[in-house]
Amino acid sequence: MAKGKFERTKPHVNVGTIGHVDHGKTTLTAAIATVLSKKFGGEAKGYDQIDNAPEEKARGITINTSHVEYETATRHYAHVDCPGHADYVKNMITGAAQMDGAILVCSAADGPMPQTREHILLARQVGVPYIIVFLNKCDMVDDEELLELVEMEVRELLDKYDFPGDDTPIIRGSAKLALEGDQSDKGEPAILRLAEALDTYIPTPERAVDGAFLMPVEDVFSISGRGTVVTGRVERGIIKVGEEIEIVGIRDTQKTTVTGVEMFRKLLDQGQAGDNVGLLLRGTKREDVERGQVLCKPGSIKPHTHFTAEVYVLSKDEGGRHTPFFNNYRPQFYFRTTDVTGSIELPADKEMVMPGDNVSITVKLINPIAMEEGLRFAIREGGRTVGAGVVAKIIA
């Protein structure tokens, strides 16, 4: 399929629909794309195009996800929708589709259901910063008091998982009516209200290049007469010749200065997020740096060994384990570019974890890794992926 030229004139924001099965996530996704395409241009997408989600792989895990794009007057949105509950769990944990904000779809006829709760918890655990609520199927509920009751329940649920329930925008409408072009308050106008909430409630995310410099170490070379060159892809920020950096993870943190930046064998004065570069480090020996460490702006990221995480364990069909694992299971944790062994502590009420489950765990690594909340990792056994996770909270 030919890729059209990407016009990046507006700020770009990543969003997605979450919520209980059959509450109307896919219908709403189709309605947003269709209604906004009429008003602001872009491609209308039908329900069938979105429901038929293509398979993709993230960290060795197969996930079905639909990607839709739409625009408002001020922004360009990339929106992800998943057909099944398991796909949501995998998507959110692997970060296959990082969300700057989520649209929680809740049926006014049913109120919050088990997956409504689970998706809010997942959003909290994996670091989705903002949630907007679309109260769907309002055309099926005549009773204003019932609508207010459902709205109150949703706000309480958001509060329970540390989202600001009282301040969360809740838009009432009917995705089905909107998709059919209905002009009543619950139809197309509800979608435009939702778009306005997206524009105003979710702040424009910081671009990778504006962050504090971070580059995972992929390879280390010794170049005679010049010193040690470390290669990798800059994850965020900018690095300029002459700047001081830290080498963090696995062993004690070291400070050094970047004396050269090269890309494709050409010398540059700086490297930035997305660039594959080689950095020449002053006075650093080849054996002082190894894969799995990171180079970073001094003080911007610290090494840690002890944290809680939300993980998804691959099923047997996905190439995962065939048997459950128990407390004190010791796999490898693959962070960025390397494996580190660690032990897993299960929640008190969980005796074991079955393939295909998702679970909150506590991990202790044998070596420290440069870590922040929201960092993704894979769980591996002898080089094959058996799970995926995200750091929820750092303990030490």
From Swiss-Prot:
Its main location: cytoplasm. Keywords: Cytoplasm, Elongation factor, GTP-binding, Hydrolase, Magnesium, Metal-binding, Nucleotide-binding, Protein biosynthesis. Residues 19-26 are annotated as: G1. Residues 60-64 are annotated as: G2. Gene3D superfamilies: P-loop containing nucleotide triphosphate hydrolases, Translation factors. GO terms for molecular function: GTP binding; GTPase activity; guanosine tetraphosphate binding; translation elongation factor activity. Mg(2+) binds at T26. Residues 136-139 are annotated as: G4. Residues 174-176 are annotated as: G5. GO terms for cellular component: cytosol. Its EC number is 3.6.5.3. It is found in: Cytoplasm. Monomer. Belongs to the TRAFAC class translation factor GTPase superfamily. Classic translation factor GTPase family. EF-Tu/EF-1A subfamily. This is Elongation factor Tu 2. The lineage of its organism: Bacteria, Pseudomonadati, Pseudomonadota, Betaproteobacteria, Burkholderiales.
